[in-house]
Amino acid sequence: DEWDCVIRNSDDKELVHSYLQFLHSLFKSEESKAFLALGYITGILPIKKIKDESALNNFREYTMLKSKPITKYYGFTEEEVKQLCHKYDMDFDSVKAWYNGYLIDGVHMYNPNSVTQAMIDQDCDSYWRNTSSFSSINTFITMNYAGLKDDIMTMLAGGKVIVDTRSFQNDLSDIHSKDDALTALIHLGYLGYDADRKSAYIPNYEVAEAFQMALKTGIWDEISKAISRCDELLMATIDGDETKVAEIIEQAHDTYTSVLKYNDENSLSCVLTMAYFTAPGYYNIVREMPAGKGFADFA
């Protein structure tokens, strides 16, 4: 178990190389044939690549990108969650907003630990609160690669971004591009991956909260300040305080859009989504909802 612990926690290339040699001798050498009938290892990362090939290419890998035929065992399926909600008298739509979103080989997958905790506590909340989560997210979203910040903003607003997962070397210390950074977050579970569209996205509100906390502890001061006012905006909206609502949305508009796209429809939709960033924690959100004439961006 945790075969990749050394890979994830060490920047010492010599140590990693020695560790891979050890694994090779254990699982792929001529000597291992005398004592090994079958090897089964688990971890977060796929087996590290050496010159674009797996260091242990005699293993069959199942990852967050490709998991057939064992996909249904990765977490709770939607049908299983519906049954649990019925058994524990929990609102399915709320559970779905908090913990759904992973689309693995076409199967909707829910975080099993979080769903279990929600059923036991009878409360939808973030059960992914350890500080290492925020540190892991920050490590990758603050990397200085062209377009990375824009992609993070797009995903925070509910969008998807194209990502090429092929160049990632399955090593968190070997990141050379925006695509590598996003692929690392996919394997760590902080991003979902749509294989049909080859795109990444933030899967649910629980993970969005982890991103929110990461932004507060990182270098994204302007974004963090805007997000910190989301609850204030939500309360002002409920109270019918149009002056306060206008003020906070104007701040969000200035924060999340450029002068060139200030009145662009997609930009305005992004502004509303980010301005009400914490709303899914309290309400089921519907985007592009039919509203008589036209559509409501955010209901």
Give residue spans per PLM region.
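Phosphate-binding site recognition
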Residues: 1-266, 278-286
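Hydrophobic, well-ordered secondary-structure elements that form the walls
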Residues: 185, 272, 298
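Active-site metal-binding core of divalent-cation-utilizing nuclease and nuclease-like domains
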Residues: 280-299
